[in-house]
Amino acid sequence: MSQAPNRLTPFFENIEFERNDGKMILNFGPQHPSAHGQLKLVLELDGEKVVRAMPEVGFMHRGIEKMAENMTYQEFIPVTDRVDYIASVANNYAFCEAVERLCEIKVPRRAQIIRVILLELNRISSHLLFLATHALDIGAMTVFLYAFREREYVLDMIEKYCGARLTHSAVRIGGMPLDLPEGWFEEMLKFCEKFPKDIKIYEDLLSENRIWKMRLENVGVISKELALSSGCSGVMLRASGVKWDIRKEQPYLVYDEIDFEVPYAVAGDCYARYVLYMREMKECVKILKQCERLYRASSREILADAPEFVSPSKEQIMTQNYSLMQHFVLITQGIKPKRGEIYFASESPKGELGIYINSQGEASPYRLKIRTPSFSHCAIYEDLLVGQYIADIAAIIGSTNIILGEVDR
């Protein structure tokens, strides 16, 4: 008779296993270098093949959605940094955009362009971390070092804008806190000229490497049907033959004015996902280059003129008494959107990042729900890992590019 699950009984003790001397139960993680966070997998093996896989999550659960109900909308922005802490601008933006749509705030054009620039730099940073750790899992130490070297340039640029390298809090409700510093664009364009050459170096080292292809081709195949039924998005969905990118299908910011391609593949294996991440970084460079023309042609406003919801600029706060009072009220009492609900989805580096807010007209959301791509991509392990060799588990997990801060929230 199985033991009834309760909050004190560990997850794996509630799983029924048939006694079979030909099978073995293996705990993968939660302290495993290839788990990319506190992920635990209970694997049932028949020889070297996985016949059953059960992901156990929750080690990094912080109750972020409940925290939002006890914080003002402005106070919650730094918390969004900790969802996907590898691409925090994507989280900042998705939350702020949802609040702006709820409050019907029109964000100035220059602020929208700066958001696109930071989002694409964040995408490159996230993809480089994927490439570095994925290569290291399979034994390619050189690519790990090269990718981290280039990632430093990206983090340095973001740091020069907002002062933080990882948890940026770079977006504000109603716009952006700062314009781009003098000389910043020139540095970014210099990076955009150099980075495609670096990508080619990665591809020369990996794409036709015999060992790399043997480890990734026809491994961890996700069919189109499985990807759709499991709620996959981003590269995980596009690698399985579904050409879907929210930036193209439901454009936001100024993405509808930018020319870029949506790479996709049909193989659905680890190698296809690797190829798409490489191609996406090239598209990010194309987007960043086009943003210069849009930025130069835009007016200097970076904060919306909505006194009920948006604080004045720092210069106005320090020089105008009315602006100081307005800022004091907004910060101490918080903004109060009208009653209603909103769901906004954006294309984060890992897939569809959605924010649902239910407002009852108070300074804190009545309910906030974060739809993270990594949660769906982790849930697919129960189907994806069955039939795979134990030696391929690290490669498959790496190719799904999950982050446990997103999974557990």
From Swiss-Prot:
InterPro entries: NADH_Q_OxRdtase_suD (IPR001135), NDH1_su_D/H (IPR022885), NiFe-Hase_large (IPR029014). Pfam families: Complex1_49kDa (PF00346). It comes from Campylobacter curvus (strain 525.92). NDH-1 is composed of 14 different subunits. Subunits NuoB, C, D, E, F, and G constitute the peripheral sector of the complex. GO terms for molecular function: NAD binding; NADH:ubiquinone reductase (non-electrogenic) activity; quinone binding. It is found in: Cell inner membrane. The keyword Translocase applies. This is NADH-quinone oxidoreductase subunit D. One of its GO terms (cellular component) is plasma membrane. Its EC number is 7.1.1.-. Its main location: membrane. It catalyses: a quinone + NADH + 5 H(+)(in) = a quinol + NAD(+) + 4 H(+)(out). Belongs to the complex I 49 kDa subunit family. NDH-1 shuttles electrons from NADH, via FMN and iron-sulfur (Fe-S) centers, to quinones in the respiratory chain. The immediate electron acceptor for the enzyme in this species is believed to be ubiquinone. Couples the redox reaction to proton translocation (for every two electrons transferred, four hydrogen ions are translocated across the cytoplasmic membrane), and thus conserves the redox energy in a proton gradient. Keywords: Cell inner membrane, Cell membrane, Membrane, NAD, Quinone, Translocase, Transport, Ubiquinone. It is a peripheral membrane protein.
